[in-house]
């Protein structure tokens, strides 16, 4: 029975034999073997966020050491490693872009994960930031729509690659459009 089921399953394409671009966050992930040992350290068994400093000293120490190392590697005076996840990091980057450029419009590809776009809209709602979505064509960011929407008030153009549909975006073409319209 096991051999029969295995022979049936072998008729399917699988991610062991083919490159996977399923999208929606379903990708092959490489996890270095050192991680298995590091997660066993006691300081990582504390809470997810260091809101209770008295029981999160290990997490705070690890964040401090990481930030210090990144600062030394990059030569920058400061580094920050306290973003929750990709969606909040995207939203924080949008806010920083608006503050740095003194512009208040963000263009985000409609092919970015919907939950990330929702988080961005939540951040933007009370900050006078206008979020406009760039449509997609055949699963990729529509470059004509980007060209039509980018303007002097655009603080940032945000894309995800591979995108929500698992398609690699033409980041080089997007970058050319953005730099042409600085």
Q: Predicted segments — roles?
A:
Residues 1-65:
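N-terminal entrance/gating region of PLP-dependent enzymes' catalytic architecture
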Residues 5-16, 39, 67, 71-78, ...:
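Structural signal for hydrophobic packing residues in well-ordered secondary-structure cores
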Residues 17, 51-55, 59, 71-91:
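Short loop-beta-helix segment that forms the pyridoxal 5′-phosphate
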Residues 23-28, 84-88, 137-140:
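A glycine-rich phosphate-binding loop feature that marks nucleotide/adenosyl-phosphate handling sites
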Residues 24, 76, 167:
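Gly/Ser/Thr-rich helix-start
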Residues 59-63, 70, 176:
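Noncatalytic linker/hinge segments flanking ATPase motor cores
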Residues 63-66, 86, 142:
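Amphipathic coiled-coil/heptad-repeat helices and related helical stalk/stem segments
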Residues 88-182:
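Conserved PLP-enzyme active-site core in the AAT-like
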């Amino acid at each position: 029975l096991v051999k029969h089921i295995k022979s049936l399953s072998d008729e399917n394409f699988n991610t062991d034999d083919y490159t996977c671009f399923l999208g929606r966050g379903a990708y092959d992930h490489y996890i270095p073997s050192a991680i298995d040992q590091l997660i066993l350290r006691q300081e990582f068994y504390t809470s997810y966020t260091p809101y209770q400093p008295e029981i999160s000293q290990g997490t705070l120490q690890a964040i401090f050491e990481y930030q210090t190392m990144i600062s030394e590697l990059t030569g920058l005076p400061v580094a920050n490693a306290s973003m929750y996840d990709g969606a909040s990091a995207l939203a924080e980057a949008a806010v920083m872009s608006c503050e740095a450029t003194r512009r208040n419009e963000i263009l985000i590809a409609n092919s970015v994960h919907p939950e990330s776009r929702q988080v961005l809209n939540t951040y933007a709602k009370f900050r006078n930031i206008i979020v406009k979505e760039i449509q997609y064509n055949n699963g990729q960011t529509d470059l004509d729509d980007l060209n039509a929407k980018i303007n002097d008030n655009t603080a940032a153009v945000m894309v995800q690659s591979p995108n929500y549909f698992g398609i690699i975006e033409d980041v080089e073409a997007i970058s050319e459009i953005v730099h042409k319209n600085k």
